[in-house]
From Swiss-Prot:
The lineage of its organism: Eukaryota, Fungi, Dikarya, Ascomycota, Pezizomycotina. It is an enzyme of class 4 (lyase). Alpha-ionylideneethane synthase; part of the gene cluster that mediates the biosynthesis of abscisic acid (ABA), a phytohormone that acts antagonistically toward salicylic acid (SA), jasmonic acid (JA) and ethylene (ETH) signaling, to impede plant defense responses. The first step of the pathway catalyzes the reaction from farnesyl diphosphate to alpha-ionylideneethane performed by the alpha-ionylideneethane synthase aba3 via a three-step reaction mechanism involving 2 neutral intermediates, beta-farnesene and allofarnesene. One of its GO terms (molecular function) is lyase activity. Its EC number is 4.2.3.-. GO terms for biological process: abscisic acid biosynthetic process. This is Alpha-ionylideneethane synthase aba3. Belongs to the alpha-ionylideneethane synthase family. Disruption phenotype: Impairs the production of abscisic acid (ABA).
Length: 440
């Protein structure tokens, strides 16, 4: 492992600290911890609770030391980013890889997956640096060669290459000035076309089936593949779990791609509970087939635990809690890409670059997953005269998402889709009914 840099957040800026200051900081933290651990005695339970809350202040300063394998330490050499930011990107890619694919038998494929994630991370907050339409050379990587290093010899090689290029195309547009163009406008409108289309587009946006395929490849399980219906259910579980937990993170980002920006918010807890239960049932049904544990492991870790284990999230900064509503400070830090987050603020700009859009549609077999071009053409101008569509997308205010605002009638149809999830899951995976009493 390679230690890269130790940094601390002071006034929303990263600075490098010396070992001596690091030691001083640890001593200070120890002193604070001792004072916080003193018992609070008060006969009035309300006063006691208030005192306990006051004794646990928000973490204002947190130090991180980034670790990652030497295999990726010299990547991004020619890319104009600060060294400390590169260190954070490498560590984020390593932590994500270890969380969502905890087991591996093929190190070379594993490293290729890390590099895929490095490219994806940069696309998410520095979209102007990534243009998959212009070149196969991205950020110093040969994209096709990296995808081949991960998937060559697997049944999903070509399909997953298109999946990842779609992710890069849309994600980089969203995180750059290109989001004011025709492609991203039509893309966000199409997200709200139907719940099934939404989950397929969110699947790609989250690299969900892509990571399932990567987990199989990194464990040399080249003989396993899923049907389209099976991929849809597996990724719907993962995306629903993740988006339920990341609800406030996504609002802080003004996100267009979050399940509960469209699904009724009051179903968030119920949806999480049902998806978690089905995941445990599927895990038990597949228990005698250890090869499939790689699939379950991804969905399980992606669906929640990464929010505690990865330093990309605010679990430590928010006193070991998950699910805190975003504050103005969090939103402001998101604009500054703290923790590699990215804020999509609304603006009045709209670029009618239909020529670029048409050129991309013509290249859809290379740059879009199967079916996306049809989604964009059919739903790109909106399909409901009551939903609120815009010329350019992003959050207009704090505590808002950045996408289409569904009307009450459309929300009702989306509610019905989510409420029949268990029935849909058991139809695709009948072993759920064979082995367990799953209510339908």
């Amino acid at each position: 492992m390679q230690q890269v840099i130790t940094q601390t957040l002071v006034d929303d800026r990263f600075i490098q600290i010396s070992d001596s200051k690091k030691s001083e900081g640890l001593a200070t933290d120890s002193t604070k911890r001792q004072s916080q651990e003193q018992p609070i005695h008060d006969k009035d339970p309300i006063k006691a609770a208030t005192a306990a809350m006051a004794a646990t202040p928000l973490v204002k300063e947190h130090q991180d030391t980034w670790y990652y394998p030497p295999d990726i330490a010299n990547d991004l050499q020619s890319i104009n980013l600060p060294a400390e930011l590169k260190g954070e990107i490498f560590a984020c890619a390593w932590e994500y890889t270890r969380c969502v694919i905890p087991n591996y038998t093929n190190w070379n494929r594993y490293v290729a997956f890390m590099r895929i994630i490095i490219m994806g991370i940069i696309a998410e907050f520095r979209g102007e640096m990534v243009d998959v339409t212009a070149s196969n050379n991205l950020l110093g990587y040969d994209l096709d060669a990296t995808l081949a290093a991960l998937f060559e010899g697997t049944p999903g090689h070509k399909e997953m290459a298109r999946e990842y290029k779609t992710f890069l195309l849309i994600t980089a547009d969203k995180a750059s000035e290109r989001r004011d163009g025709e492609l991203f406008r039509r893309y966000v409108n199409a997200l709200a076309q139907s719940p099934r289309h939404w989950f397929r587009m969110r699947d790609c946006d989250a690299l969900a089936r892509f990571t399932i395929a990567s987990a199989l490849a990194c464990n040399d399980l080249d003989d396993i593949w899923f049907t389209e219906d099976q991929f849809e259910i597996l990724t719907e579980i993962g995306d629903t779990l993740y988006d339920a937990v990341a609800f406030y993170k996504h609002r802080a980002e003004g996100e267009t791609n979050s399940t509960f920006a469209y699904m009724p918010e009051d179903l968030r807890i119920k949806a999480y509970s049902e998806c978690r239960e089905i995941l445990w049932a599927l895990d038990a049904a597949w228990a005698r087939n250890p090869k499939l544990a790689n699939v379950i492991n991804f969905v399980r870790f992606f669906g929640g635990p990464i929010h505690m284990m990865m330093r990309r999230y605010r679990f430590v900064e928010e006193n070991l809690t998950i699910g805190k509503s975003e504050t103005d400070k969090v939103v402001d830090q998101t604009r500054k890409n703290f923790k590699l987050w990215n804020r999509v603020d609304a603006n009045k700009r709209s670029v009618l670059n239909t020529q670029r859009y048409k050129a991309l549609i013509a290249r859809s077999e290379e740059l879009m997953f199967p079916g996306l071009a049809e989604f964009l053409e059919m739903g790109g101008d909106g399909i409901c005269d009551k939903c609120k569509y815009r010329e350019s997308y992003g959050a207009e205010l704090s505590h808002q998402f950045g996408g289409v605002e569904l009307c009450s009638e459309c929300r009702l149809s989306w509610r019905k889709y989510l409420e029949c999830f268990v029935e849909r899951a058991t139809k695709v995976f009948p072993e759920l009914k064979t082995h367990f009493e799953v209510p339908v």
